[in-house]
């Protein structure tokens, strides 16, 4: 990883910042979520995302490059063997930062950074199902419109006056029963 050139350093020097990020990444992979300051969480996110992308490729060269960044063999083995397969279907966005309340002693803003291991909400199959369902709805709507147009074109038949009077009588009886129930 190149030497950081811009912005404030975590801990003062570039070498100290690299060690801080290395230790934070190792703890994140080991525990799945850690609480740290907002500044450290924001710097840790791209660092961890690049490491996970290398772990997903899984080559020997990638493993050696990750071991340069995180010199803990157990954590790297866990990352390559167990965490990387969980992220196979995810193209990116392996971490989530949630802001928490400020720290009690120095009022520093605290965040929780965690690994997102849930499956993506929309996979390709689910997307295909949604597209097919929306096309079916459109076809049903078009069919309903066609039926409505046919009904409008059909000649109107005059209603029988006897059936109208019978319907009015039934409605009056129902209203009387409703009034009696109250």
Swiss-Prot record:
Residues 150-161, 170-182 have a biased composition (Acidic residues). It comes from Corynebacterium jeikeium (strain K411). The gene is rplQ. One of its GO terms (biological process) is translation. Keywords: Ribonucleoprotein, Ribosomal protein. Residues 137-149 have a biased composition (Basic and acidic residues). The keyword Ribosomal protein applies. GO terms for molecular function: structural constituent of ribosome. The keyword DNA-binding does not apply. This is Large ribosomal subunit protein bL17. Transmembrane segments: none annotated. Belongs to the bacterial ribosomal protein bL17 family. GO terms for cellular component: cytosolic large ribosomal subunit. Gene3D superfamilies: Ribosomal protein L17. PANTHER family: LARGE RIBOSOMAL SUBUNIT PROTEIN BL17M (PTHR14413:SF16), RIBOSOMAL PROTEIN L17 (PTHR14413). Residues 126-182 are annotated as: Disordered. Part of the 50S ribosomal subunit. Contacts protein L32.
